[in-house]
């Protein structure tokens, strides 16, 4: 989880003065929102319904999520906000780009 936290905080996806993706969250001092989303583990290769057999068991996943949150909070003083693990949530955001990356551990 330390490696994932390092990547989340250090991945250069924010524009510098030249408009190039060259600044990290740590560089910008922005906040981090961590929300558990098991649907990202869906296997959509066949059929018309996603399979979640590759997702970690809920208890294991929650421990991992909490560990990642703890590490990010230690390493990112500007702040880390979270959703509630396993809860249905309505999340509002502005995606400037749109730019979305899937970081793998």
Tell me what each language-model feature is:
Residues 52-105:
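Positively charged, low-complexity, intrinsically disordered RNA-binding extensions
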Residues 4, 35, 99:
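Residue-level signal for inorganic ion chemistry
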Residues 1-29, 40-70, 75:
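Compact, glycine-rich, soluble single-domain proteins
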Residues 33-39:
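Active-site-adjacent structural patch at catalytic or cofactor/ligand-binding sites
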Residues 17-32, 81-94:
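Glycine/charge-rich, flexible interdomain linkers and switch-proximal surface loops
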């Amino acid at each position: 989880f330390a490696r994932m936290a390092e990547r989340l905080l250090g991945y250069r996806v924010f524009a510098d003065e030249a408009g190039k993706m060259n600044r990290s969250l740590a560089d910008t001092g922005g906040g981090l929102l961590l929300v558990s989303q098991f649907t990202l583990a869906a296997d959509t290769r066949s059929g018309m319904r996603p399979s979640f057999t590759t997702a970690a068991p809920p208890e294991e996943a929650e421990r991992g999520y909490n560990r990642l949150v703890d590490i990010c909070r230690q390493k990112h003083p500007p702040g880390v906000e979270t959703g509630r693990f396993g809860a249905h949530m309505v999340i509002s955001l502005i995606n400037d780009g749109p730019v979305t990356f899937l970081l793998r551990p």
